[in-house]
């Protein structure tokens, strides 16, 4: 029996980037199937102007990076840098939905995270998304058409609707057998949850699993 892990994440969330490592390892160890779903931390600002609420450089955000994100990245051996921008990610999610349709979602997501957290590029810009598409063997001009026509908008909206169904307001969030685990989870925690789900016992044990406060809430 293969357990499905629904993962809600956003490409501007450093914890989502770092959490991918434990997630992939847990899936490999158990045979679980990962289903990535879109979540927009700045969805409420899509029609607003002014500086983003998740803008880097403030005292609070700097403290989070110094006290939490960098130490976690060091433990995992992951290269990550605090970005200088906080773009809207709707186009990135639509591009990712298109990449999933073409069977290269994992590669494209890796490109998105690397572009933002290592290269400090604006993944809300069409030109950047086209370059990332090219990097994974996709046609950048076709992507431009897909995004201009919002061909994948319905898929993204469906993910956001599912997130609301589970009352998800922070990322990363994992849904396993109908139960939500919030925040970055250790590989061992995910493996335990998957095994409990296979045994049909996750309902009784879900509340005993740690819900780590290592996540980011929607602004």
Please name every model-derived segment.
Residues 1-3, 60:
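Short, intrinsically disordered, charge-biased short linear motifs at domain edges
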Residues 3-9, 15-31, 36, 97, ...:
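C-terminal cap of thioredoxin/glutaredoxin-like
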């Amino acid at each position: 029996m293969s357990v499905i892990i629904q993962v809600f994440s956003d490409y501007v969330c450093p914890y989502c980037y770092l959490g991918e490592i434990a997630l992939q390892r847990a899936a490999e160890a158990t045979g679980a199937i990962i289903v990535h779903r879109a979540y927009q931390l700045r969805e409420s600002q899509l029609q607003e102007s002014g500086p983003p609420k998740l803008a880097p450089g403030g005292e609070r955000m700097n403290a989070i990076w110094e006290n939490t994100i960098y130490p976690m990245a060091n433990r995992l051996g992951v290269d990550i840098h605090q970005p200088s921008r906080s773009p809207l990610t709707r186009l990135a999610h639509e591009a990712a939905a298109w990449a999933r349709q073409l069977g290269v979602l994992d590669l494209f997501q890796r490109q998105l995270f690397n572009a933002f957290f290592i290269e400090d590029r604006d993944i809300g810009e069409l030109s950047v998304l086209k370059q990332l598409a090219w990097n994974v063997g996709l046609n950048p001009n076709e992507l431009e058409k897909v995004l201009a026509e919002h061909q994948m908008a319905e898929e993204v909206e469906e993910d956001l609707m599912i997130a609301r169904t589970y009352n998800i307001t922070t990322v990363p969030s994992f849904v396993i057998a109908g139960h939500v685990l919030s925040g970055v989870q250790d590989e061992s925690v995910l493996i335990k949850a998957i095994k409990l789900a296979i045994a049909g016992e996750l309902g009784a044990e879900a509340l005993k699993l740690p819900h780590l406060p290592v996540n980011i809430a929607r602004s």
